[in-house]
Design a protein with these regions (language model features):
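Active-site beta-to-alpha loop of glycosyltransferases that engages the nucleotide-sugar donor
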Residues: 5-21, 36-37
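Acidic donor-binding segment of Leloir-type glycosyltransferases
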Residues: 20-69
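Short, conserved alpha-helix that lines the donor NDP-sugar binding/gating region
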Residues: 53, 57, 76-88
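Short, acidic/glycine-rich phosphate-metal binding loop used to engage nucleotide
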Residues: 70-76
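Catalytic-site signature of metal-activated, phosphate-bearing donor transferases
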Residues: 76-81, 102-294
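Short beta-strand-to-loop acidic/aromatic patch adjacent to the donor-nucleotide binding site
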Residues: 83, 90-104
């Protein structure tokens, strides 16, 4: 089975190297669209200013699997369409990956076998979304949401939309056998390790974007980064509990829009790549945290 991975990224160097490494061996190709969308263009940001490009260009791509395009786009759908245009025609499935998602070889093999058995149109994941470090994940609606990541590839198909990822063929969305993350978890035990709320810098920039994005504009907690994320990260257990009780969790969306999202202790095992680099990642985390002292 030939799986092509697709990544969109801007200033995502915190876990990008580990993310690429975790999927490289299983990849038919890794297609990356690096650059900015309209919001960042309006702020004068047109490309990554951290080590994102360095990580991609210096990754030991011995099998020439990595295909990179840099540019600016209207929105994330257009950015995804850019990497999708690089997908080889003999691909069986495309797997959308965030720059802070890590997949283990064992889980990838389970997923590949599952794809062979079920032949789904799309496949979602239940997410272990880490918050403010490596010990706790976001529960509630975040935990129950199905993050659609894998899409069946048909020759001649095009990328329709980013939210949630959907392909189309002959002007019609490719739909049918769509399997959710909860079903995948029930059948295989597979979840998605997602470092989406670890890096202070990336959380700060994510919230700046989300506060203007169509999907979340007007629905975010005011001063979320300072009053929720930073206060939680720097707080004691009592302080953290008070913050979560006030906002019914820690997700940036106002609780009335999506429901509760209290944190939970992570009970799983970190991927070997994360354990190997944990000391380095904690040092990066602490260094970034010092940049946001109010």
């Amino acid at each position: 089975m030939k799986i092509t991975y697709g990544i969109i990224v801007l200033n995502g160097d915190f876990l990008l190297r580990q993310a690429i490494e975790s999927i490289y061996d299983s990849a038919h190709a890794i297609c990356i669209a690096e650059g900015s969308v309209s919001y960042w263009n309006s702020q004068g940001v047109t490309k990554s200013t951290d080590d994102t490009l360095k990580i991609i260009k210096e990754f030991p791509d011995k099998e020439n699997k990595i295909k990179l395009i840099s540019g600016t786009w209207k929105e994330k759908t257009e950015q995804c369409q850019a990497w999708f245009n690089l997908v080889p025609n003999d691909t069986d499935y495309v797997w959308c990956v965030d720059s802070d998602e890590i997949h283990t070889p064992e889980n990838i093999e389970k997923v590949k076998q599952y794809l062979k058995e079920k032949n789904p149109t799309s496949l979602g994941f239940k997410s272990d979304s880490f918050y403010g470090g490596f010990d706790r994940i976001i529960g509630g609606f975040e935990r129950e949401h199905s993050f659609k990541r894998i899409l069946k590839y048909e020759k001649g198909c095009t990328y329709l939309t980013h939210r949630q990822p959907t392909l189309e063929l002959n002007g019609k969305p490719i739909q049918g056998n769509d399997i959710t993350g909860n079903q995948l978890f029930k059948d295989t035990g597979v979840t998605m390790w997602h470092g989406s709320y670890i890096s202070p810098k990336q959380v700060y920039e994510k919230i700046q974007y989300y506060e203007t994005a169509v999907i979340s504009k007007g629905n975010c907690i005011p001063n979320y980064f300072k009053d929720v994320y930073l206060e939680w990260v720097n707080g004691c257990d009592t302080k953290r509990m008070a913050i979560e009780n006030k906002w019914k969790g820690v997700q940036e969306f106002m609780p009335h829009t999506r429901g509760a999202s209290f944190t939970e202790k992570y009970k799983g095992k970190h991927p070997e790549i994360i354990m190997r680099d944990m000391s380095e990642l904690i040092t990066k985390f602490d260094s970034q945290l010092q940049e946001y002292v109010y």
